[in-house]
Amino acid sequence: MISCIPDERTIRTALSLASRAPSFHDAQPWLWRVASDSLHLYADTDRRGPDTDVESRGVLLSCGASLHHCVAALAALGWRTKVQWLPDAAEPEHLAALELYPHPASALDVMLASAIPRPT
């Protein structure tokens, strides 16, 4: 099966929900890039607290939360994801590449994604 990208509205919705992920000091240290056939997650280490997150652990945890929210949102919107971790060893900020495939959303997918926008 060949990976493809959904329409712009679906991508915007998924990335909007991904941006609601909790982050260390509310820094939102992630960057999402859309390619012709995949989505890419990058760590933005310039947004880490230089005194409080020296080893960028908070950045990585925050990016993982954003990735989770993106995958959950895409599942609810009818897209299955295949995540490739650290796709480019020469570029350590490139944390993940997501291949997307159309797939029917389940009731559980919708329920999980519906919990994302709720304030905690």
Regions found by a protein language model. Name each.
Residues 1-120:
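Acidic, surface-exposed loops and disordered segments
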